Amino acid sequence: MPDRTPDEVLRQTLAILAPGTDLRDGLERILRGRTGALIVLGFDRVVDSLSTGGFALDVEFSATRLRELAKMDGAIVLDRDVSRIVRAAVQLVPDSSIETSESGTRHRTAERVAKQTGFPVISVSQSMRIVAVYTGNRRYVLEGSDAILGRANQALQTLERYRARLDEVTGTLSALEIEDLVTVRDVCSVVQRIEMVSRIADEISGYVVELGVDGRLLSLQLDELVGGVGPDRELVVRDYLEASRYEGPLEAVLESLAGLHQSDLVDLSQVARVLGFSVGGDSLDSAVSPKGFRLLNRVPRLPGAIVERLVDQFGDLQKLLAASIDDLMTVDGVGEQRARAVREGLSRLAESSILERYV
């Protein structure tokens, strides 16, 4: 499966196998029937070259057909969309030189076929009554909804605490930006918290995929808790990227933040290093000024193109806050009505941010 990372392939495969899908129903039937199965999720020339015996079917997929075909020896080959059963009772002969950590014949074959073809392969163990999914070099054992929900709810509680702390440090940053008292430490604290929220949210979204129809409520709770976090992540970095004198593109900074090890993420000096700020001594307490992207994006009905022009024209937030309606009208695309909306919007944000901090 080209152009997809191993994590993406695994997540998409788990979505196909989630509760409520026909394939999951078929696997549950196989487990209840106390039989095993070897199922390849895709068919091409490579899979064909590894296949001997069996018979071609090319019939519509259904859970009951999968269950009946699993009673026979040999593998079942489905198409990539899991909409048709291509072959059944097939003996798969992958390259025996491919390394495998499995001991059972069915699992060894599944792992080797997954590595050689690039398609996900499912192995249902008759003796252990487990379903293992192989994607490339990855092996994943399917769990029941109750076990996944238990972990997901625990992660959701952690996310709620992280989000509350993020809102707190973000509110503090807004007030400090208005007063022009921001330090590198304040910026890094917000970026750190956004990244922590993003990571726990990614973990929960994986649970949502695995849960399928059982994860609808969890999905709604997740959407509510992470609303606005993605845009804020980019806007905060854009606000201070020039101040840090970082010479690379914005996307490179965001990728570096995402790639930080968990132990480095809790160290603000490591976050500062990724953002391009100098590290050492009292550098975290150095004063910095934002460009104004984040606060301007909180002004209602202000197009992104106008935000870009305002920042280009005035350079930083303090000059934007000091600008009169006439000054704002000098920006291309900003008439009197929009200038007044920007002026009043920034004034309200300034007032509310300071009130939230000191009251």
UniProtKB/Swiss-Prot annotation:
GO MF entry, a single one: ATP binding
Binding residues annotated for ATP, in chain numbering: G74, L92, T105, R106, H107, R108, T109
Enzyme Commission code(s) on record: 2.7.7.85
Catalytic activity line of the entry: 2 ATP = 3',3'-c-di-AMP + 2 diphosphate
Cofactor(s) needed: Mg(2+)
Name of a matching Pfam family: DisA-linker
Keyword Transferase: yes
InterPro entries referenced in this protein's UniProt entry, alphabetically: DisA, DisA_sf, DNA_integrity_DisA_N_sf, DNA_integrity_scan_DisA_link, DNA_integrity_scan_DisA_N, DNA_integrity_scanning_protein, HhH_motif, RuvA_2-like
UniProt record, GO biological process: DNA repair
Oligomer status and interactors: Homooctamer.
Chain's role: Participates in a DNA-damage check-point. DisA forms globular foci that rapidly scan along the chromosomes searching for lesions. Also has diadenylate cyclase activity, catalyzing the condensation of 2 ATP molecules into cyclic di-AMP (c-di-AMP). c-di-AMP likely acts as a signaling molecule that may couple DNA integrity with a cellular process.
HAMAP family assigned: DisA
Family label: Belongs to the DisA family.
Protein name: DNA integrity scanning protein DisA
Gene this protein is translated from: disA
